[in-house]
Amino acid sequence: MKQFLDFLPLVVFFAFYKLYDIYAATSALIVATAIVLIYSWVRYRKIEKMALITFVLVAVFGGLTLFFHNDEFIKWKVTVIYALFAGALLISQWVMKKPLIQRMLGKELALPQQVWSKLNLAWALFFIVCGLANIYIAFWLPQNIWVNFKVFGLTALTLIFTLLSGVYIYRHLPQEDKS
């Protein structure tokens, strides 16, 4: 259910874009993201940091898009989020000396430090590449292509990279954890 909620604002954004325009889609995205955040609080009495950061960025960049009637702001939001994710991963590894991926999954998985570091760097690189791809597609290709890329392309890339990460993790699990 939680994973569905995470994708709900994206589905709403896409539907409103197809039915109306980028500005209606942006308004719907802000409202849907707020509703998901409120629902998460009511249902689980908890709001994840990533969800809160995403909402703030959606509200700020979406608000700027609507106020200035300029879709460039909402297009930048994707890259800014990915840059923040990549930055957090890199800072966790080089400054805090414990990769963020390990902080998130380390209680459930026993992996060598080198595996955590490689996985953390791989995700940071993934977010950097996705952010750069977003810039290219958002500002050099037609808007409808960007919307499709944002909704389907980035979602598919993230799912594929998550599966590949799972395979990488599985290969490095201790034998007793593989069963």
UniProtKB/Swiss-Prot annotation:
One GO CC term on file: plasma membrane
Keyword terms: Cell inner membrane, Cell membrane, Membrane, Transmembrane, Transmembrane helix
Record-linked InterPro entries: YciB (IPR006008)
Subcellular location, record wording: Cell inner membrane
Main localization of the protein described in the UniProt heading: membrane
Pfam families for this protein: IspA (PF04279)
Transmembrane parts of this sequence: 22-42, 50-70, 76-96, 121-141, 149-169
Membrane topology: Multi-pass membrane protein
Function: Plays a role in cell envelope biogenesis, maintenance of cell envelope integrity and membrane homeostasis.
Family annotation (NCBIfam families): ispZ (TIGR00997), PRK00259.1-2 (NF001324), PRK00259.1-3 (NF001325), PRK00259.1-4 (NF001326)
Family: Belongs to the YciB family.
Protein name: Inner membrane-spanning protein YciB
Top-level taxonomy: Bacteria, Pseudomonadati, Pseudomonadota, Gammaproteobacteria, Enterobacterales
Gene: yciB
